[in-house]
Amino acid sequence: MRRLTYRAASFLMRKSLANILLFSMASLHLHAQDVTTLVNRVRTKLDKVKDYHATGDLKTDVAFLKVPVSRVNVWYKSPDRFRIKKEGGISLLPKGGLSFNMRSLLMTENFTAVPAGESSVGGQPTKVIKLLPTDDDADIILTTLYIDEKLELIRRATTTTRENGTYDMQMDYGRYGPWGLPDKVVFSFNTKDYKLPKGVTFEYETGEKPATPEEQLRNKKGKVEIRYDSYTINQGVPESVFK
């Protein structure tokens, strides 16, 4: 009788563990579906913007560099044409073509979305979602998005690439939020991945000139901030702008 009772208890325990495992797997699958749906909702919102021309102020904060705040013009044309031009004719070209374009964060449609909990960005609650490209040859290895689920806005994104290191973007939104376009973008990166624009000069704190600019920039952190004051959306942008 005791043996039967033990066997029955063992069977019930194994059955319970199997049910828990199945429930956990089903729950993970549903969560993955939910975050994929959220990413696609954000993509649909950004896809409403076919092109824009924006103006704003650009501030560069990089060690050993003297870069004044500049007025800039920014152009975008779907799906991946993007250019920043400083007034005076100097184009700003981060190494590898790193872009402040929101749509570039969701360029690939071949990805696996993995839920990674919740967090807060600038006091706003967000869903944390990791995007893993299914293409083994893709330059992007991992993108972590912090999405405001209620407003369908990307408030922060951290991207790791094969060729250009890891960079982070944090966004603030205002009147252009319904288009998914930020009022402010702060772009943080490792300075070894940054290509110096023409006309930028070094400032030396010790009076001693370093061996090379590359040595001065090695293992330093940099930030580029753009504060937009206006966008002209879906009014057409000539292809000549990008040449």
Where are the predicted features?
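Bacterial N-terminal signal peptides
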Residues: N19-S27
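Flexible, processing/modification-adjacent segments and terminal tails
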Residues: Q33-K48, L58, K66, W75-L153, ...
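Bacterial N-terminal signal peptides that target proteins for export
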Residues: L4-I20
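Gly/Pro-enriched, hydrophobic low-complexity segments
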Residues: P125-F242
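Sequence/structural signature of outer-membrane beta-barrel proteins
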Residues: D61-A63, K192
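Extended beta-sheet lipid-handling architectures
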Residues: H53-G56, V67-V69, I84, F187-F189, ...
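Sec/Tat signal peptide C-region and signal peptidase I cleavage site
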Residues: L28-A32
